[in-house]
Amino acid sequence: KPAILIGSHLDSVPAGGIFDGTLGVIAGLECVRIIQEQDIPLQYPIEIIATSEEEGRFGGMLGAQALSGSLTLDWLENAKDPTGETLKQAMAARGLDYHEALHAKRNPEDVKAFIELHIEQGPVLEASKKTIGVVEGISGVFKWLIKFLGKADHAGTAPMDLRSDAFMGLADFAHEIKRIIDENGTDKSRLTIGRVDLKPGYAHTVPGEADFTLVGRDMSEQVMRDLADSCRKALSAIARRHRLMFEYEQMSWLEPKSCSQHVMDVIEQTTQELGYSYQLMPSGAGHDAQFFTDITPTGMIFIPSVGGVSHAPDEWSHWVDVEKGCNVLLNSLLRLQATL
């Protein structure tokens, strides 16, 4: 029989927290333990999924993309991380053959539904004093590696008006982000410079190169395209203004996805029956679930993140909220058994 899949990912970002991803995997194990202990009959088997590389070191979500059939050989052969190490090299160093990822695709006929329990990774639920978030859709995201190329000069002898200072180009672009969103985005739009590397990196040397990442998000793919176009135009204008060259490489482009209305209804009805407060909400962060939408009805359950903190060592969710999230997951699974 086709299975209902539950789970999430086990990896997190460097210096991340203990709840991101792991919550969904451990909660899945706990649900199955309860079902076995109480000998609850199932119409459809339940499988627990623990994916790898969700955080996008190489620009995608390797595990979920492999399972959903979203990988291409071209991407596998060319994906690399911000340091330049390729996915092929990283897998080979661990005795893995990247070609095998192409054979991990699940047959949609063998999958009945997918549900992912996850921390919100934001402040909305806590601020609204809600226990559960019923996710309506997952934001799209693009990731670029950008390079401004100028000229390294002596910081004492190079006049300010004759410099080709790569960092000044980066600083100008960072200042433009708010304008770009105001003119082209929505209240769901995000643009983030998360990593910067200045070269040669000496206190008394004008930076000749600035390498940085740019991550853009929105719930509309057209808005994402508008943001990307505006960013390209701004980068080009800034490069001319500061006598620089600029290059960019798109590491990934993940479309926004909508959750299954039926699975959303099941999660909402379950939450109501349990007496928990909740709200419908989008996910501003990317998740494994967005790839499973391509092959099966998919839903997500959020629980509050204390202070909205995530991707940091002090990431935390109260255990009472973890318990309630697990209860919603378990009872949604059982309700789906009878309604799919």
Residue locations for each model-derived region?
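Flexible, small-residue-rich helix->loop connector segments that border functional cores
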Residues: 31-45
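Acidic/His- and Gly-rich active-site-bordering loop/insert found
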Residues: 1-17, 35
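Short amphipathic alpha-helices in soluble, non-transmembrane regions
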Residues: 227-236
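Midchain, well-structured core segments that form catalytic/ion-binding scaffolds
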Residues: 11, 53-222
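A short beta-alpha structural unit
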Residues: 192-201, 213-215, 219-220, 245-264, ...
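Zn-dependent metallopeptidase/amidohydrolase metal-coordination segment
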Residues: 7-8, 278-328
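Flexible, glycine/charged-enriched surface loops at secondary-structure junctions
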Residues: 41-45, 101-105, 157, 179-193, ...
